[in-house]
Amino acid sequence: MTHSRNYKTLRRFIVPALAGGALAALAFAPTFGAEPVHSNVPPQNIFAPKADAPNANMPKNDVPRPDDVKTGEINEPTPHKEADPSTFTGTSVISENKTLEHQRFDNTTSDQNAFIGKNKATITIDSSVFDKQGNTTNDDNSNFRGQNAVVLGIEGSQTSIKNSNITSNSIGSNAVFATGEGSVINIENTNIHTKGDSSRGLDATYKGTVNGKNLTITTEGAHSATLATDRGEGTINAEAAKLTTSGAGSPVIYSTGNITANSINGVANKSEIGVVEGKNSITLTNSNVTGYHDNGFMLYQSFSGDAESGIARLKAENNTLTTHGTGAFIYVNNTTAEADLTGNTVLMPNTTTLVKAAADSRWGKDGENGGHLTLRASTQELNGNIVADSISTVSLDMTNGSSLVGAVNTDNTAKEITLKLSKDSTWTLTGDSYVKSLTNEDTTGSNIHLNGYKLVVADK
């Protein structure tokens, strides 16, 4: 599919950078945590960039992604065979157990890394500076294998970094990248800042794992999510982090694997809060996250080869979730998805669409690319309309005192929409609504407030 490859851009998200300053600057002990969310990227006064931002011209094989997709233009990347990460080179390549403090790891050569941990080595690094400049020349290697990243973990290595500063100022320079089963990077009390396109904050592929705690991550480029997984799946666990993106197609979270985030403050200034592609997941708890573009969350399948087909999953509990976009709070297309919402505050000032399940011409085969969502709400207030097209379905299950204020399938276009209400859950209509079936534990129907509108149940 020509369309499929392009929006994958969304996933090329995470990290541009500032440079280090003198070693004395390492004396900082970064403190992060529950800072208020800001709509703009906060100034980074501690570190100054070592050089001007790279030339805006992208390498031949680095394809502009989200904007081209949105305008319908087709711009296929040149295919490349992914390289074996064991052949990658860098400033410091460590293959044996080692403990380091107060080090600098700088690299300015294209397709090299500042640091590589390999060969099942256990490596501990404290109070150090990592900086990367020099654009990637191979989009697939940098996105999927971690070439040209600042910090790379491969071959089952276990790398721990704390009290440090990680920056990049080049295209395709992810900040912290783990690839391959058993490869783990643990990072704590660290500042991360990337400036180039396709430069994510924490990234994992092919069953690699990155665990982050007490982090500040800022990305400025397009396709640069702060938390991301890509081809072959990967795992990201983030806790107590401040996350900010300012590039197009750079959500706070992009999952082609499994990403869990707890107690984060996140802002995507030109993108959605989060995106799940294929049989993968986002779990978000006790957090405050905001997106300014498109939808709140998108769950989809591109068939680009980066994500297995299956159920896309979103689980959100005890968060404040804000979308300033004009799309839907949850948009599902070309996949089957499940969303579990529990006790969240949902804010959507610029749209009245809570859920949209519909085909999208960018992905899938016409007539077969609808969205299919099961939405479970527990102790959850929901405000907004539920819409679906003729090849899409929505199933809403409300329990434990949940409420919906909105119209369901008001244009009667959906293939199928079903509702279940517990006795203590309520639905207040704001427009005529059409559903295939309605299961209500309150046999009197007193928990449904028609508000003067028509409710039509097909299977009655």
What residues fall within each predicted segment?
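Bacterial Sec-dependent N-terminal signal peptides
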Residues: 1-17
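Post-signal-peptide, soluble extracytosolic/periplasmic N-terminal scaffold domains
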Residues: 100, 117-195, 203-212
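All-beta strand scaffolds that present successive hydrophobic residues in beta-strands
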Residues: 94-102, 122-127, 158-163, 184-190, ...
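Bacterial N-terminal signal peptides
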Residues: 16-25
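N-terminal segments that cap or nucleate solenoid repeat domains
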Residues: 65-137, 455
